[in-house]
Design a protein with these regions (language model features):
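PRPP-associated nucleotide enzymes
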Residues: 1-159
């Protein structure tokens, strides 16, 4: 994949995206009681959105699907530890990820949460046209591969 076939997000873009997503969420009247960030890509946006929305209750859900650029497992997998969402049965939960590409990771997380939580909404920085999930809150739509500032540098530790 050529560099010009990619979309590049900067840390500054993340700040703008979070402000705009928070404004969307507020304007819809959705007041989440908790934010669930999908690890690992959703952690920066999830944490920043929790701050922007004044939400102190946060959790993470580890989902493995992508193994490289355009490389993925057959199915997304929930990885331990899986949060106990039973205390949120009547609460409002915002599930946050960086991108809904195929949407299968977000669908797995949303469906898992819907079994335990009263009202589940989804927010992403980017949504792609082929996503099987139509997110409730989206900053940008694109069909390009996205380079995020937290995942673009090469890993320090050898795998």
């Amino acid at each position: 994949m050529t560099e010009d076939a990619r979309e590049w997000m900067t840390w500054g873009d993340l700040g703008v995206a979070v402000e705009e997503l928070a404004a969307q969420i507020e304007s819809e009247g959705f007041r989440p009681d908790a934010v669930l960030a999908l690890a690992r890509g959703g952690l920066p946006a999830g944490g920043a959105l929790a701050y922007a929305l004044g939400v102190k209750n946060m959790a993470t859900l580890n989902v493995e699907f992508y193994t490289g650029v355009d490389e993925r497992l057959d199915e997304p997998l929930l990885l331990p530890p899986v949060p106990d969402l039973s205390l949120l049965r009547t609460e409002r939960l915002l599930v946050v990820d960086d991108v809904a590409d195929t949407g299968r990771t977000l669908a797995l997380a949303r469906d898992f949460c819907a079994e335990h939580v009263g009202d589940v909404r989804t927010a992403v920085l980017y949504e792609k046209p082929q996503s099987v999930v139509r997110c409730d809150f989206v900053w940008r739509r694109t069909d390009r591969w996205i380079n995020f500032p937290w995942s673009t540098p090469a890993a320090v530790a050898a795998e």
